[in-house]
Amino acid sequence: MSRVALIGENSIGYISTLIDIWNNGDCAVLLDWRIPFATSLDMMIEASAQTCFIEQSLFDKVDVEIPNSINFITYDKQNNAAEQLPKFIYDKFKENYSHAEAVVIYSSGTTGKSKGIILSHFAINTNADAIIDYMRPTAEDCIYIAKTLSHSSTLTGELLVALKTKMSLVIAPTIVPPRYTLNNIAKYNVTIVCLNPTLLSMLSNQYERKNYELPSLKTIYVSGSILSDKIYDKAHATFPNTPIYNVYGLSEVGPRVTAQRAECCKGNSVGKPIKGVEVTIVNEQGNCVVDGEYGIVHVKTHSMFNGYIIGHPKHVSLCEGWHNTGDVGYIDINGELHIINRVDDVIIIDSHKVYPSEVERRILEQNDVKECAVAKVEHNGNELIGCLYVSREDLNNVIREKLKAKLLTYEIPRVFVKCDALPRTKNGKVSTYGVQTRLRKHLEQNNNIHIKGRS
């Protein structure tokens, strides 16, 4: 078994090459084509990949020295438009439940350096089977892939599901205007689409501008980051006849952990554990908490990853035999999981825990605020809570006054900064590091600023 890198935009050529790597008994190191090529080179070297299949158009743009230790092989994307997966792709796909390495997926790096996550064929195939169990696709269904295939949720929850069930699949480029996606959903009679909250918000906004006819669309699945109540409510109002289900997971566990289903989970939870997965919530001492109490989410599954290329899990398990997800959450009285924040994002102010997502939820109740992100930032030796928000107007004082009636004093951000757009990672997640950098820069440029309130 060798590790073989693969770099390319979504295309039939990409999928065909991926299956060829697997059929040759090798492990595919999936690298996002949008990251700098120098970073991809570092990842290849880290993963000991000696061969790299790369889309010809991307290879033509390489402007750094290429090491002799890696053999680059180009392939043609062939088509820049969305297209249906042809029969020969389904025919050459072979189900594989061995424990040999299947893929190396690099984490999104929302809080730091990306880590190479090793997943076996057994892990991704058993997880895909569990997804099929709740998704229940039929021969009449058609799934639309709008996110990059180098991410575990797209690879396992969309591509593998389609290949295993022979469901029709439309593969589309990733960086396109929302009207392109909506037009293709109509053109190809798409029934299932999987989005992240950012894409869902973009499609909702575009749909409001022009009333598209989407009679075939029967299900929208949302994953990738916490779905705010504001986006959730707007999407349900925009697509009243299309069920919208939250799903949750992380690459280290296959990736899917929980999912909403038609027979349950009506609110903005992330659903219940899927087949073969167990979830428990524990406190910092490793003791299980009661329903409704916040704790650290731990998962037990047969789809567990094989480890990292370099390093160890950042969050040590607090419950023997379970994987620490690094997420704070709780289970409600209906047995549904709710994700609150990453453990790393929780802010400690005067021994009090502040959950950014809860502060953000209150800020987003202000209609003129389109998006916001709350994070901890250091200034003159002190730790403060700061907020970046997107709005047409400067609403600093308005937001602050509104929060006084809804939050405790120490939960209210000390500094508010209006911006045109929130900083995001390559896959659309809000970058905590980017938010902190923007806030820190603002404070440095306004060193004598009077920061109102006390936290």
Describe each model-derived feature in a short phrase.
Residues 83-106, 113, 136-142:
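Conserved pre-ATP/AMP-binding loop-to-beta segment of ANL
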Residues 193, 301, 328-411, 437:
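AMP-binding/adenylate-forming catalytic core of the ANL superfamily
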